[in-house]
UniProtKB/Swiss-Prot annotation:
The keyword Phosphoprotein applies. The keyword RNA-binding applies. GO terms for cellular component: spliceosomal complex. It comes from Rattus norvegicus. SMART domains: RRM, RRM_1. RNA-binding protein which may be involved in pre-mRNA splicing. PANTHER family: TRANSFORMER-2 SEX-DETERMINING PROTEIN-RELATED. There is a cross-link at K80 (Glycyl lysine isopeptide (Lys-Gly) (interchain with G-Cter in SUMO2)). This is RNA binding motif protein, X-linked-like-1.
Length: 388
């Protein structure tokens, strides 16, 4: 393993840090002609690292020096003199070439392994980060959930379903509204980007899906969805802000969402319906998956109670906690309607639910969304009542 460096090259270790090239030349020059003296110095401080390489013109002279000078004292320190080995040159702080060499490779390995580890984690973080960036800190609180979400997103709408479930869990697990919102944001955020042009469309069709998918999510994470109520408001904030940033916010104010804080509060969103539609859009975002999710979820929802939970979570999304009771009832009814629709088929919910989101998004700045959102939710409510 240990390969001797070129003949005549000696490794001198254990040097006093004050020993310089001239001192080495004075000591070793007595044995023969020296071709090169390489004193290893610290790059930053430029101080001696305690070892050097002295190359003699004649290998025989080098052997004599190694025999005579090894273990001798130089400038108050016992030095080690031996045939230089290639590895020792690179990492020979200790002195003996072999030890440094062994040391060096491990370092490299560590570095490599660390690097490999680092990059992957970084990659993950990147994903999270990227998402988080989009989601506004979603990564920081729930990077993992976010991760789950984003990949599905990129994967496609169906994955989004999984994403919502992930986020919901994350929110519940996180125990913080923000996480959920972020997780959702992450979902909402990327979906926004992807569907931006077709947001409305997405909302229209995804709504039903969103319900169903969300239902599926909620069914999976009903608890979390309930938790999401708390978290939900923040998601809304994000969605509001993110979705329509200026326009949606404006709409909200006009609607009575007035308070962006209201986003945080979401309670003041008396226009739960619109909130619902947003939620729907949320859901649609989360589940761009549309119809398929609806199929699965209705059975799982099976009971209106889930919807209630769901609706409550939606309320969370809607964020109108204050109007939970009223909005919930509306939402419940609407949810039930949707459930019924889903059970019957997506079209009903699509008709009722989709238009409101469209209005919101398309005319969020106008304030028409209010009416649209409310109307949509109302229709849902009406539908829900009929079903009930």
């Amino acid at each position: 393993m240990v390969e001797a460096d070129r003949p005549g090259k000696l490794f001198i270790g254990g040097l006093n840090t004050e020993t310089n090239e001239k001192a080495l030349e004075a000591v070793f020059g007595k044995y023969g002609r020296i071709v090169e003296i390489l004193l290893m110095k610290d790059r930053e401080t430029n101080k001696s690292r305690g070892f050097a390489f002295v190359t003699f013109e004649s290998p025989a002279d080098a052997k004599d020096v190694a025999r005579d000078m090894n273990g001798k004292s130089l400038d108050g320190k016992a030095i080690k003199v031996e045939q230089a080995t290639k590895p020792s040159f690179e990492s020979g702080r200790r002195g003996p070439p072999p030890p440094p060499r062994s040391r060096g490779p491990p370092r490299g390995l560590r570095g490599g392994s660390g690097g490999t580890r680092g990059p992957p984690s970084r990659g993950g973080y990147m994903d999270d980060g990227g998402y988080s960036m989009n989601f506004n800190m979603s990564s920081s609180r729930g990077p993992l959930p976010v991760k789950r979400g984003p990949p599905p997103r990129s994967g496609g709408p169906p994955p989004k379903r999984s994403t919502p479930s992930g986020p919901v869990r994350s929110s519940s697990g996180m125990g913080g509204r923000m996480p959920v919102s972020r997780g959702r944001d992450s979902y909402g955020g990327p979906p926004r980007r992807e569907p931006l042009p077709s947001r409305r469309d997405v909302y229209l069709s995804p709504r039903d899906d969103g319900y169903s998918t969300k239902d599926s999510y909620s069914s999976r994470d009903y608890l979390s969805s309930r938790d999401t109520r708390d978290y939900a408001p923040p998601p809304r904030d994000y969605t509001y802000r993110d979705y329509s940033h200026s326009s949606s916010r404006d709409d909200y104010p006009s609607r009575g969402y007035g308070d962006r804080d209201g986003y945080g509060r979401d309670r003041e969103y008396s226009d739960h319906p619109s909130g619902g539609s947003y939620r729907d859009s949320y859901e649609s975002y989360g589940n761009s998956c549309s119809a398929p999710p609806t199929r699965g979820p209705p059975p799982s929802y099976g009971g209106s109670s889930r919807y209630d939970d769901y609706s409550s979570s939606r309320d969370g999304y809607g964020g109108s906690r204050d109007s939970y009771s009223s909005s919930r009832s509306d939402l419940y009814s609407s949810d039930r309607d949707r459930v019924g629709r889903q059970e019957r088929g997506l079209p009903p919910s699509m008709e009722r639910g989709y238009p409101p989101p469209r209005d919101f998004y398309s005319s969020s700045s106008r304030g028409a969304p209010r009416g649209g959102g409310r109307g949509g939710s109302r229709s849902d409510r009406g539908g829900g009542q009929k079903q009930i």
